[in-house]
């Protein structure tokens, strides 16, 4: 029934801009300091996963726009391009990285180290999606873009994830499926988004295995406060929850 969305909109509707009369506003300064960063305005661009649904180049386009405006961009864990490309597109504007904490601690550590290496100024941990919700519209439409290889570029570009693929390779008979047009189109979509040659990804089955591996480790409903010291050990960056 989307009651949560309605409640969120109602909460924002209750916010009011309070006018202040007879104040000198001939010179206005909207700058603010956040996490040691001097920002020209109190704005950050929030992470949005699978932006390629809007446009194939959307992730980098948003990063370039953020860079041009000097607005920090929290780039998504579920982006369709690696974080390094998004950070490069931002120029001198500082990026932040959204972290979905997966079942693999080694992968979490690798993501954090990559984010730090490409200039991220903070790790923003998403806590409300340790398990996907019961999304009735998505269920009615059989809608999960991850199954088409969308939005998993942080994973397929990561050496730890690639190592997991090698360690957890399925026997040939385990990946057989009935051949249908939808199945062929799904496999092609996965292969086109997998790094390297589309044909090689199809022949090796690696693109399909990557999607299977992602689905198996993405959710981590066991995450608790007790896990946070591990993250603190991986980085000196600020951690936002």
Predicted regions and their residues:
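N-terminal capping/small domains of soluble enzymes
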Residues: 1-131
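Active-site region of glycoside hydrolase catalytic domains
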Residues: 135
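A generic secondary-structure micro-motif detector
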Residues: 51-52, 101, 217-218, 239-240
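Conserved, well-ordered alpha-helix/loop/beta-strand core segments that scaffold catalytic motifs
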Residues: 223-239
